[in-house]
Amino acid sequence: MLGALYYIKQLQCLKRIQINKMSGCSIGSVLCLLFKLDNLDYASQIYTTLRNYFKQHGHLYIISNVLDDLLLSIPKHFYKTCNETLFISYHNIKKQKYIVKHKFKNNHDLINAIKKSCYIPFLCGPKMLFKTQFVDGLKPYFFNDHKTLFLNLFSDYKTIFSMINIQNELNNSERIIKGALDIHTFFKTNKPTYMCYFIDNTTIYHRFFFQTRIVIIYFLTHFIFFIYYCSKFIKRIKYYQYIRIFISIYKQFIKKITYTYLKLFMV
């Protein structure tokens, strides 16, 4: 995605295209922010920091600190330029709602929305939910009143696998080049590519994978909701202290399995 954004930024500088609004979730929300800051180079620094940290610790708890560091580099009133132009999505598990944030009170509020959008349970923090209720957006918000270009990182199983398979990569230069070539092909041929397409001009293939993604998101968010409220109920049980020991062991087991699996691709 980063390579595609570099390409789009260059077209924007040449006044070949006009960007009115941007929407993103998870790492996409970070890249949208960097795009608006005209600081896409910072993404490579974030990539290196997260990769090295995961290699040492087996999780990405540092992501909150990374975003706090980014906050320090943002101009004081920058958030005003993001109101109604930057749309960040995340899930409120407590209310079972898909939230799209597009108005911000200040820069801190903006970064806080991105933290919610990037939070993957137990991987980005020690708890299931960020601030007891929020998790990753999982899908960006679509604009129905504008021509919308979708940079889809989950367009098929190949892109999903390649996204997490970074074992032999020293940096993200190759990914940047691939992203730039993909969107170059899109504009050159005016046809959907693996990653890039207009949402009003998709193939059956892209629609199938996106609808599959929606179904997975539905079940995943409801599963998290179920686990969260089951844990609340269990705390009221008389022998909760014994159950808590079991839950703690189970959490450590899940974390260990997750780390071992991801380590095959990320370290």
Predicted region positions:
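Patatin-like phospholipase
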Residues: 1-22, 33-267
